[in-house]
C-alpha cells in the first residue's frame, strides 16, 4: 500500500480495512483495521469496528506492518560518489539525494536516522510535502578530529584554526567538520543543533574509507567527546559515534555516548560494558560482497570488519544488549537498491520475528533517544 499512502495529503483520513497486522512487538499477527489521521496511526481495532470518512483501502487480508526504519543511513552520501562529495556542484548532488529519498520511501523505509551529511534542506522539503521521502532524523555535519574518519582534506592541505575562513568543500556544504579541542567540538555540536540536528554524530575511531587513519585508531580525547555529549544533553538529545575497537568504544561510553555505531571489532568485556551501561549498539551485517573500495588497504580493513561481525553479533545476543540496525551504504549510487537486501543478512543470527522487531520497534526506541 505504500505507493498509495505516499501520494496522499498528510491531512487526509485513511482507513485500511481487513489486514493481517504485525504491530512491531508481538510475534503473532492479528486481523484488524487501522485508522490513520494526519499521517499518524490513530487507532487499531477488530475488523469492521471503525467507521470513518476519507480514503478507504481494502487490504484483502494482506500483511501490514510498521514502516521500516534504517537507523544508519546517509541520505546524501548513499547516492553520491566520493568524487561527487569532493568536487561536484551542490545543486547536482542535492537533486540526486532528493530523487533517492523517494526511492528510499518506496522500498518501505518510512523513517531513517541520517548518520551524517547535508540533509537539513532535504528533510524540510520532505516535511513540507515538496518531494516524497521518509522522515529524517538528521545528524548534520560529521564531527571529526584532524586526521580522523571525517577528514576529507587533500594531503597537502595544512591544519588550520577551527572556524577560519579556509574551509574545505565538504565543510562548506555541511558534510563534515574538523574540530579539535573541547571548545571547537562544543561549537561544532551546537551549530549542528542550531541547524536542526536530532542527534550529534562524532567520529571516535578509524574507518574503512578513511584517508589518514587506521581501523584500530582511537580518536578524540574523552574530554572532547564529553563536550559533544554535554552540548547534546543540553538540547535534550544524545551523541552517536562511529567506532570499531574496544578501547575507543570504552572511552566513548565513559564520556556519556548513548549509541555505538558499528563496533564490529568489540571484545567480550566491552560488550558487557555496553549491556551494563544500557548503551545502544547499532550494527550493520557487512559481507565481503559489499567490498567496493578502490585501494588494497581499504579492502583489507573491510575484510577485517566482516571477519569479526559474527563474533560481535553473538556477543550482543549473549549479553542482550539494546541492538539497532542500519545499512551505512556509502558512495555507490548503484548499491542503494540493496537496502532491503541487507535486512535479510540478519538471518545469520536472528529469526524472522526478531528481525522485523529490530527494524521497526527496536529502531524506533533508539530514535526516541532524541525526544519527540
Region spans (language model):
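His/Asp/Glu-enriched, well-ordered alpha-helical/loop segment
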Residues: 234, 307-372
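Histidine/acidic residue-rich metal-binding segments in metalloenzymes
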Residues: 183-281, 302-323
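Divalent metal-coordination and catalytic microenvironments
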Residues: 19, 39, 61, 69-72, ...
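Metal-associated gating/positioning segment near the N- to mid-region
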Residues: 62-128, 146-153, 223, 255
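Active-site mouth loops of central-metabolism enzymes
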Residues: 82-95, 164-187, 238-240
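Active-site environment of divalent metal-dependent phosphoester hydrolases
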Residues: 76-78, 111-122, 206-211, 244-250, ...
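Divalent metal-dependent hydrolysis catalytic cores, especially in the metallo-beta-lactamase
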Residues: 96-122, 133-142, 197-210, 238, ...
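Histidine-rich, glycine-flanked metal-binding segment
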Residues: 11-13, 21, 25-65
Amino acid at each position: 500500500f505504500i505507493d498509495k499512502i505516499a501520494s496522499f495529503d498528510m491531512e487526509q483520513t485513511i482507513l485500511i480495512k481487513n489486514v493481517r497486522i504485525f504491530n512491531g512487538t508481538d510475534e503473532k499477527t492479528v486481523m484488524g483495521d487501522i485508522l490513520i489521521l494526519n499521517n499518524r496511526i490513530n487507532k487499531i481495532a477488530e475488523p469492521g469496528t471503525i467507521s470513518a470518512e476519507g480514503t478507504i483501502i481494502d487490504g484483502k487480508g494482506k500483511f501490514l506492518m510498521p514502516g521500516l526504519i534504517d537507523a544508519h543511513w546517509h541520505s546524501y552520501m548513499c547516492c553520491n560518489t566520493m568524487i561527487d562529495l569532493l568536487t561536484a556542484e551542490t545543486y547536482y548532488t542535492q537533486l540526486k539525494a532528493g530523487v533517492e529519498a523517494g526511492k528510499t520511501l518506496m522500498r518501505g523505509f518510512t523513517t531513517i536516522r541520517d548518520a551524517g551529511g547535508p540533509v537539513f534542506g532535504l528533510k524540510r522539503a520532505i516535511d513540507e510535502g515538496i518531494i516524497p521521502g521518509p522522515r529524517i532524523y538528521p545528524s548534520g555535519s560529521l564531527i571529526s578530529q584532524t586526521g580522523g574518519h571525517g577528514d576529507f582534506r587533500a594531503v597537502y592541505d595544512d591544519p588550520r584554526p577551527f572556524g577560519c575562513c579556509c574551509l574545505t568543500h565538504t565543510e562548506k556544504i555541511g558534510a563534515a567538520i574538523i574540530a579539535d579541542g573541547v571548545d571547537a567540538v562544543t561549537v561544532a555540536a551546537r551549530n549542528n543543533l542550531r541547524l536542526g540536528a536530532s542527534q550529534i554524530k562524532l567520529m571516535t575511531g578509524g574507518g574503512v574509507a578513511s584517508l589518514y587513519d587506521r581501523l584500530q585508531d582511537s580518536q578524540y580525547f574523552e574530554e572532547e567527546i564529553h563536550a559533544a555529549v554535554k552540548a547534546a544533553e543540553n538540547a535534550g538529545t544524545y551523541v552517536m559515534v562511529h567506532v570499531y575497537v574496544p578501547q575507543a568504544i570504552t572511552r566513548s561510553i565513559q564520556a556519556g555516548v548513548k549509541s555505538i555505531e558499528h563496533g564490529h571489532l568489540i571484545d567480550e568485556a566491552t560488550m558487557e560494558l555496553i549491556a551494563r551501561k544500557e548503551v545502544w549498539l547499532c550494527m550493520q551485517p557487512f559481507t565481503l560482497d559489499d567490498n567496493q573500495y578502490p585501494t588494497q588497504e581499504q579492502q583489507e580493513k573491510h575484510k577485517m570488519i566482516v571477519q569479526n561481525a559474527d563474533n560481535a553479533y553473538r556477543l550482543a545476543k549473549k549479553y542482550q544488549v539494546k541492538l539497532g540496525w542500519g545499512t551505512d551504504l556509502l558512495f555507490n549510487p548503484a548499491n542503494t537498491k540493496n537496502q532491503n537486501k541487507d535486512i535479510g543478512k540478519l538471518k545469520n543470527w536472528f529469526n524472522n520475528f526478531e528481525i522485523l522487531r529490530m527494524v521497526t520497534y527496536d529502531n524506533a526506541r533508539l530514535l526516541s533517544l532524541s525526544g519527540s
